[in-house]
Amino acid sequence: MLITLISSPVSKVIAYTEKESSSFTKDEIKTLESSSGTGTSEKVKAEFKGLLEKLFSERNEAVVCGDCELLKNFYDLNIKVSLWAYESEAKKTQYLINWSEKQYVQFKDLKSNVKIRKVVEKEPGLFGIICDVATDFNYYYLDSPDVINHFRLGTNHYINLKKNGDKYIITKEWYTDPFADSLDMDNIKSDEIKDYIISRNAPEFNPNERLQNAINYAHKYCGVSEDEEFTFKYNSKYKNHNPDGGDCANFASQILHEGGNFKKNGAWNYDGKDGTKAWLNAQGFKNYMLGSGRASYIAKGNYNKVYKAAFNMRPGDFVAYEKKGRITHISTVTGFDSKGYPLVTCHNTDRLLVPYDLGWSNSNIKFHLIHVHY
């Protein structure tokens, strides 16, 4: 399976974590977004594109090799904020390594495509950079190494690079974090889970026309489409609600209406600029779909409780993610991997055919697996 880590300008929902001084504040992001600086210089962009491609290549290699030590070349661990930035990135890299062990898979041939949006010289030798990154991950199950799977993930990066001798180091970094709710893997790693996953096979699946159109729409407008014409793009008919707190339910509603031909009504509606709670809000969307009879439960609970039932999901169904008693995210199932593991497509962070639990591994996360009646 291939993961593409894509940094997308349409993904701008900001979540701050510990050690914020190693990350960007909201004001710093606004300042960098509004600065002209050297952003119009294609020569400067090309210079930093090469530097960042090397950075992301090393990060990818760390995931493939299972060795976070490879990340250290891009940080000065004697500088506190650079050390914190390294520790944050190492923790996320370790999560990917841990997830692959849980899943009994091996990553291979990761590749990143970096698109520089802006470079600003903040002071002599210190540059603020906004970039979009597309990283393709391949992985295979260890019992079937000849079968390669693929998916894509979108993120948007804000990075401070400081000249340090003959190289640049990262002093600050923030990006739309697909793993913010996923850094605790100890609660789900077990031989029982691994054995069950590798015992499965992808089911036969023949979607009707409505469902196929919904899948096609999801893959086209997810923000990380494999069609280069639509990469980093949403459907312009709809407002991007990421800056308002999230666009996941809006996109799930679009998939049903634009792709699946589900009709709008008074409760579930969008007028071109704004929508109802059932259309735009993750909790409201889940409640509406169940209450209206357009969908029904498959299972709900933490990962250990639902991972077997998840193999009953089919494209067109959706996963609602619960945190602290509230539904905070919606993803639509649009495919399977080679073991029949459900793959989801969504906005914020933009995902294309990503394993449904990747990025949602903390013990306080509950999954609502919901079947849609096409």
List the model feature ranges, each with a label.
Residues 196-279:
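N-terminal capping segments
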Residues 343-346, 357-374:
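Low-complexity, Gly/Ser/Thr/Pro-rich intrinsically disordered linker/tail segments
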Residues 24-102, 220, 258:
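Core segments of small alpha/beta cavity-forming domains
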Residues 3-29:
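Sec-dependent signal peptide cleavage junction
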Residues 91-143:
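Surface-exposed, charged secondary-structure patches
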Residues 22, 146-200, 342-347:
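Short beta-strand edge/turn micro-motifs at domain boundaries
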Residues 106, 117, 123-124, 273-343:
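...with weaker cross-activation on analogous glycine-rich loops/strands in unrelated enzymes
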Residues 113-119, 155-162, 331:
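Hydrophobic/aromatic beta-strand elements that line small-molecule binding cavities or substrate pockets
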